[in-house]
Amino acid sequence: MTQSTEDTLLRLAAVIDSRKGGDPEQSYVSRLFHKGDDAVLKKIGEEATEVVLAAKDVRQGGAPTALVGEVADLWFHCLVMLSHFDLSPADVIAELERREGLSGIEEKALRKRREREANGG
């Protein structure tokens, strides 16, 4: 990720954060925040489904730009969700950096071991 890309994510996250106390009649993001957890999480599900459908369309000759647009929608709504739960893109980036260099199998085994240890096992 380039510094410019990270800056874009952080700028967008700052705008989203600024909408937390905003007027739900004036801002889509403020409206989602105002509606609460279920509305934010439902939107993530809807956007994820649209990504899957767009990806399938690309395999059948659909426009790759449609997939990019749907992924952008999903990422945006994931940023809204992170903000809603008082998290930031930096938290996700830190987790990705922590996982970097680990195989998926190795990372999953470490996660399961940590879960067992946390549960007293």
UniProtKB/Swiss-Prot annotation:
GO terms for cellular component: cytoplasm. It is found in: Cytoplasm. One of its GO terms (biological process) is L-histidine biosynthetic process. Pfam families: PRA-PH. Its EC number is 3.6.1.31. The keyword Nucleotide-binding applies. Its main location: cytoplasm. The keyword Hydrolase applies. Pathway: Amino-acid biosynthesis; L-histidine biosynthesis; L-histidine from 5-phospho-alpha-D-ribose 1-diphosphate: step 2/9. Keywords: Amino-acid biosynthesis, ATP-binding, Cytoplasm, Histidine biosynthesis, Hydrolase, Nucleotide-binding. It catalyses: 1-(5-phospho-beta-D-ribosyl)-ATP + H2O = 1-(5-phospho-beta-D-ribosyl)-5'-AMP + diphosphate + H(+). It is an enzyme of class 3 (hydrolase). GO terms for molecular function: ATP binding; phosphoribosyl-ATP diphosphatase activity. InterPro entries: HisE, PRib-ATP_PPHydrolase-like. PANTHER family: HISTIDINE BIOSYNTHESIS BIFUNCTIONAL PROTEIN, HISTIDINE BIOSYNTHESIS BIFUNCTIONAL PROTEIN HISIE. Belongs to the PRA-PH family. This is Phosphoribosyl-ATP pyrophosphatase. It comes from Burkholderia vietnamiensis (strain G4 / LMG 22486) (Burkholderia cepacia (strain R1808)). The gene is hisE.
